[in-house]
């Protein structure tokens, strides 16, 4: 496998810490040892997150190609768009963000706080759009790029989650290589890794990265899109492409992609009772905050799998905390009593 052949523009601090979740593990019976890899602490650029790791492999193309405007898309509380805005500010580039109405959640402050507030503060041109949720290429995003060109600019396209970009999975291959290095220092290997999946490239890159040592199917994706078949197909397609790019040496098949479909409901961006319980448990036992859109759902999935005995006793499980906490502010009504 050859990741080093791709240029990387460093936007992160370095290897993210792996934190033992001792109190949460004990609360859930103590038969499984839970850990978290804190991607939510990976950068000083507006709180960072998994998209910042991905952007390290996209930004060289933007800089080398003389692009002057980063153009991205997401929901109103998109972590992706916040991280793109931060990178643009850091590099002195312009930024246009399309924020679609992906979540059926009504709150007077939903489009004024959290991620979207930070993007505005960082100087991004934020454009609200009424279109609903989908993980594919969007007409509103293409129109934003056309608008930049019409104004004499040179737009660099960054799709939702970086996922439709050919190099969108490379950062998560690097995540897997980083975990392997940390495992050597810890003196043990993780039996499973739990990660949230929506647009697919995070899990896809991890599948490829861990396929290098035979653990592709130990990457357990927790669907948060509530459109799991579409997400599964996108993970598989991106993983196949990424495996070819990094010269993995074998094809990625459906058996390599594990996506748990039980925890994404009722809709994208809307938490269920299990999501809310998981957010509170993580916060109250570990002081680790998660959000209702992504990490709360993957945390719910991990907790429930422990409760159901789906991880064998003695397993060491690594939870990939991808970020997303700024969105909590947009859901403040749900937590008005804690």
From Swiss-Prot:
Q: Which Cys-Cys disulphide bridges does the record give?
A: none
Enzyme class at the top of the EC tree: hydrolase
Q: Could you list the residue ranges forming a coiled coil in this record?
A: none
UniProt modified residues of type N6-(pyridoxal phosphate)lysine = 51
Name the Enzyme Commission number(s) assigned to this protein: 3.5.99.7
Q: Where is the active site?
A: 78 (nucleophile)
The GO terms describing molecular function are: 1-aminocyclopropane-1-carboxylate deaminase activity; D-cysteine desulfhydrase activity; pyridoxal phosphate binding
Q: Which GO terms describe its biological process?
A: 1-aminocyclopropane-1-carboxylate metabolic process; amine catabolic process
| Reaction equation(s) it catalyzes | 1-aminocyclopropane-1-carboxylate + H2O = 2-oxobutanoate + NH4(+)
Q: Which cofactor does it need?
A: pyridoxal 5'-phosphate
Return the InterPro entries for the record.
ACCD_DCysDesulf, ACP_carboxylate_deaminase, ACP_carboxylate_deaminase_bac, TrpB-like_PALP, TrpB-like_PALP_sf
Could you list this entry's UniProt keywords, alphabetically sorted: Hydrolase, Pyridoxal phosphate
Q: Which HAMAP family match?
A: ACC_deaminase
Task: Indicate the family of this protein.
Answer: Belongs to the ACC deaminase/D-cysteine desulfhydrase family.
Quaternary context: Homotrimer.
Protein role: Catalyzes a cyclopropane ring-opening reaction, the irreversible conversion of 1-aminocyclopropane-1-carboxylate (ACC) to ammonia and alpha-ketobutyrate. Allows growth on ACC as a nitrogen source.
From the Swiss-Prot or TrEMBL record, give the protein name.
1-aminocyclopropane-1-carboxylate deaminase
Q: Which organism is it from?
A: Variovorax paradoxus
Recorded name of the encoding gene: acdS
